[in-house]
Amino acid sequence: MLTLANHTFSSRLLTGTGKFSNATTMKSAVSAAQSNIVTLAMKRVASNNAQDETLKALRELGVTLLPNTSGAKNAQEAVFAAELSYEALGSQWVKLEIHPDQRYLLPDPIETLRAAETLVKKGFNVLPYCGADPVLCKRLEDVGCAAVMPLGAPIGSNQGLQTAPFLKIIVEQASIPVIVDAGIGKPSEAMAVMEMGVDAVLVNTAIATARNPVAMAKAFASAVETGRCAFEAGLGATSNVALASSPLTAFLEPTV
């Protein structure tokens, strides 16, 4: 079970809603992924009406909505976006995203920390998208974030776990949930990072752009569950030399 801000969720796979060909496919994929938490863009939240098929589909699924502040270029804009989402949905959940660079969409660490501190004081459950920086993640934890969401690779790139060495340090040091966000392109990568000990992953592009998004969502759900089971079971130690699994006895030597 995944616990965030005193709320418990059965799934450790969070999904996004962007890039799907239509709302029906998105709804089927989210259902197949068995996700309890789903992110959505502020433009969906701001509309907040029955005409928005994506928002309608998500409400029918009964998932927890996690509005993001994507598009915000600084802390002030992000705080404003979060307050708008609260007015529209009455929810204090927010995925904090501040990436002024539109080419690589890398998060601004300084503005993210500033916005996180402000939003926590305002009573929001803040889940910040951030670089895989162990020092920054501890600072975000210190200001009261409900979790940290370090990237595996740039958003939408499907490049996989480019930041794996730093993710390991973040997991080792964190006292709050670690959710790897961005860059995961294959179920095997989701499984690998879950084996590492992260608490959850967020996947959007890899599912939405697959030839069969629903089947891919199922694959990711299985991978996340398998990876978590492996972590909890306790992975065997690695060795630089061979270690025989059977006794090396002298039974082939001639007897006297």
UniProtKB/Swiss-Prot annotation:
Pathway in which this enzyme or protein is active: Cofactor biosynthesis; thiamine diphosphate biosynthesis
Record GO cellular component, one term: cytoplasm
Binding site for 1-deoxy-D-xylulose 5-phosphate: 156, 182-183, 204-205
Keyword tRNA-binding set for record: no
Domain of life from the UniProt record: Bacteria
Listed EC numbers: 2.8.1.10
Family of the protein in this entry: Belongs to the ThiG family.
Quaternary structure and interacting proteins, as annotated: Homotetramer. Forms heterodimers with either ThiH or ThiS.
Descriptive protein name: Thiazole synthase
Source organism of the structure: Alteromonas mediterranea (strain DSM 17117 / CIP 110805 / LMG 28347 / Deep ecotype)
